[in-house]
């Protein structure tokens, strides 16, 4: 089952809608926060609502938190692992690649209670053939120093603010990005073309590549999946961001 987020307020979860969707066959809820592609994050009220659902239904949770260290404006990441009840029911997934700029290494981890972890390993052994041992040793040594990941929010927030300020001087309308290194932008003042078509136009005619948000929907081509939104990635050198902004000013 799916429980669509609400775009007003900004991509928030309607927890009553989630609760209403849970039936007798529901075993697990999957969450992704900080959220790709919207950049939305959870707050304490979300954890309160989720606790209430878990307490009532006993449903298990799979929480994709790979952007856990990329949250902005001084707000902490609201991890499910911070609440004992949620932690008892959760598989919390994260990524060394996102945290340490090593996405090509494909090294991540899962935190779960012993009983859940044992079940996960039964599946994992058939899904993953091998992970590079040298890279795991390198990460184990590097993560002993917390400074690199503690500095991530300020590092990426500066880039987020740079892109947002630049887009403000274009016909794009940047949306809030409280987490991740992605930002959505509304292009409805430019054209009403479908998102995939507009993304293709930007790449071919302006040399700036974006992702159509409709690509993340169950049926990307459906009219209800197109909201004139594209996703920018600001995990780039400042010079690259500035060059992109200059090109987008002419769109």
Question: Where is each model-derived feature located?
Answer:
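PLP-dependent class I/II
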Residues: 1-251
